[in-house]
Amino acid sequence: MGDISDSYSGGTPTAGKTEYYGGDIPFIRSAEVNSDSTELFLTEEGLKNSSAKMVNKGDIIYALYGATSGEVGLARLNGAINQAILDIKPHANYDAQFIMQWLRKSKENIIATYLQGGQGNLSGTIVTSLLIDCPTYVEQKKIGDFFADLDTIITLHQRNISLYTKNSITPSQR
């Protein structure tokens, strides 16, 4: 992975410094790698005075720590990341969607290989050492787009099922 991308993780501003929080910069944490919103926001001062790093919408973001280890998504907003997230920027001729889908598919194997009994943390070194066999860029794009479309269809069906379940009348209501 390190041969086909650049990567970095961020950091967390000092928690006791209220002037670092409540600004306009979304602060993406590991439980939010597949979310289009965040609970916390940083100020410019908080970003500047910490090792938090900015990511761009469309970057691959990969959770390294705890219960969310191995969760992966494409950033849905520009924001800052903490040390529990690795930002992965593919080099030219490598498709972010394809790489993200490969990481998603490989999650169980990565965790089984690198985390003892599912405990512990992944690291940027582990992720960049992963070997990924990439087809041509055109094929990567087709594969990545196919799985993105499939994810969209699944999400839409899940929403429909939720709406149907929520709005259905139970036999006791008849």
What are these regions (language model features)?
Residues K17-V33:
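Short beta-strand/loop turn elements enriched in aromatics
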Residues L131-R174:
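Amphipathic alpha-helical coiled-coil/heptad-repeat segments
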Residues A15, G79-L86, Q116-K141:
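A short glycine-rich beta-alpha junction/loop motif
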Residues E108-N109:
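Extracytoplasmic/periplasmic mature domains of Sec-exported, cell-envelope-associated bacterial proteins
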Residues R29-A31, E39-R104:
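A short beta-sheet element
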Residues M1-G11, D36:
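Non-catalytic DNA-recognition/assembly elements of restriction-modification systems
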Residues E71, T113-Q116:
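Short amphipathic beta-strand starts and helix->beta connectors
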